[in-house]
Amino acid sequence: MALKDTFKNLFNYFEVDEVNEVEEQADAYSMPNDRPKMRVANTTVAPVREQQPKVETRREARSESQLQRLHERQQELMTNNNEKEIVKTTIDIKFPKRYEDAPEMVNLLLDNASILIDFQYMSEQQARRCLDYLDGARSVLSGNLKKVSNTMWLLTPVNVTVNIEELRNAGTTTGVADSNFEFDIKR
């Protein structure tokens, strides 16, 4: 509207004779106001006052609903934290019998599971092949692969640390007689 008035005033500046005609046209379209000006001002102000409390109540309702949702979310997070404390870590024990069982163990590693692998049911050549495959997967997934015994290996995801020194120290304190048993018992 202001832009339109600016252009009218610009044209009116150069055309002095038509200014009176424009003012006369504006007067012809205006309606005479029978009511007093004070009464008109009161009626226009009253609806504005009624709309403002409605907006405030909407805002209050929004803030109350947001507070309620926030409270519910906090309760949900608290229950989730309690459940996380209860969850125990498990280690899957696998006895692969052939090389084709290796991808299954890699899938467990992808699911952040720790796997204790016992190669006692595989030939030495297949066990080395399988171990090579698992070592490649471990390096790609940034996991850990530790030797536990002659035929057992522990494959863990990146978020699990293994302190193998305690296991080695425990093996040396048992005595010389236990270290002579290097054969595996087949089940």
From Swiss-Prot:
Q: What is its main location?
A: cytoplasm
What are the UniProt keywords, alphabetically? Cell cycle, Cell division, Cytoplasm, Septation
List, alphabetically, the GO terms of the cellular component aspect.
cytoplasm
Location in the cell reads: Cytoplasm
Cross-referenced InterPro entries: Cell_div_SepF, Cell_div_SepF/SepF-rel, SepF-like_sf
> What family classification does the UniProt entry report for this protein?
Belongs to the SepF family.
So what does this one do? Cell division protein that is part of the divisome complex and is recruited early to the Z-ring. Probably stimulates Z-ring formation, perhaps through the cross-linking of FtsZ protofilaments. Its function overlaps with FtsA.
Checking PANTHER family in the record gives: CELL DIVISION PROTEIN SEPF
The protein's name = Cell division protein SepF
Naturally occurring in which organism (per UniProt)? Streptococcus suis (strain 05ZYH33)
